């Protein structure tokens, strides 16, 4: 959804959100990156009084389903803060892991910004019915299984997703709330 339409959804509470690494580069390729994204999602959800119903962190993008506990959602503010905070720490992780070639590709000299980790903006889809939430959860959980990714054989095998929480009752690094508590 384009930014100009977000004001129409100010009083909606549940969204499927996608944000992507700049140029679709595969940045998230080791546990420190996944841990950073997981802990950052937890912090942002707590700061904006929201709960995460599902997620997947892929090598070059992430999806999550979020529900806000306030009358007005703060999705744009949450995403701004999440991307700003993670950008700084992702850059540090890239430097520490010696990924100078990738850092060169991410170089970006505009104003005070030296590297561009995330693409501008994000995509969001309002989820108003249980069936739609279930469709998006299925999509999230099957994303790592797609032939072009081949990151897992079964949804619950991929550790950076809510699939283990839903299918195997496994604890997740991202603090999750079961969608049936709301739908």
Predicted regions and their residues:
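Short catalytic/metal-binding and nucleic-acid-binding patches
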Residues: 1-183
């Amino acid at each position: 959804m384009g930014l100009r339409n977000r004001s129409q959804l100010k009083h909606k509470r549940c969204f499927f959100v996608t944000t992507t690494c700049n140029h679709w580069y595969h940045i998230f390729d080791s546990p420190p990156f996944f841990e950073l994204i997981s802990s950052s999602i937890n912090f942002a959800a707590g700061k904006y009084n929201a709960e995460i119903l599902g997620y997947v962190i892929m090598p070059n993008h992430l999806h999550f389903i979020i529900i806000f506990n306030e009358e007005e959602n703060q999705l744009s503010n949450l995403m701004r803060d999440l991307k700003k905070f993670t950008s700084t720490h992702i850059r540090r992780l890239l430097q520490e892991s010696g990924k100078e070639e990738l850092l060169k590709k991410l170089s970006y000299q505009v104003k005070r910004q030296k590297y561009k980790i995330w693409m501008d903006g994000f995509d969001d889809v309002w989820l108003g019915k249980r069936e739609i939430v279930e469709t998006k959860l299925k999509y999230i959980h099957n994303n790592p299984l797609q032939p072009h990714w081949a990151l897992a054989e079964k949804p619950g095998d991929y550790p950076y997703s809510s699939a283990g929480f839903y299918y195997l009752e496994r604890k997740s690094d991202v603090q999750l709330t079961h969608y049936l508590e709301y739908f």
